[in-house]
Amino acid sequence: MAVTGIENVLQQLQATALSAANGTPQDGVAQGTFSSELKAAIDRISDNQNHARLQAQQFEMGVPGVALNDVMLDMQKSSVSLQMGVQVRNRLVAAYQDIMNMQV
């Protein structure tokens, strides 16, 4: 089993840390509106869930090359991304309620 997935994540983290230290935006990152960024995040969560579901189905059917550890890792990634999305939604709702309760 290759560890290239971890190496890619480490490279992305290092690039993010470097660009944050330099104060420059990352290459290829477009400045979008809030709604487009929110939609993109929801799409990524959906893609993670679909990929994990597909991996699990392939493992259950006995497709060669699909290992149990990969399935479990994808399922956990999917779970964590969904939990993150729910927490972001909760924060947005709380912020909206705070704004709505402000007196004018």
From Swiss-Prot:
It is found in: Bacterial flagellum basal body. GO terms for biological process: bacterial-type flagellum-dependent cell motility. One of its GO terms (cellular component) is bacterial-type flagellum basal body. Its main location: other. GO terms for molecular function: cytoskeletal motor activity; structural molecule activity. Keywords: Bacterial flagellum. It holds the Pfam family FliE. It comes from the Bacteria. InterPro entries: FliE (IPR001624). NCBIfam families: fliE (TIGR00205). This is Flagellar hook-basal body complex protein FliE. The gene is fliE.
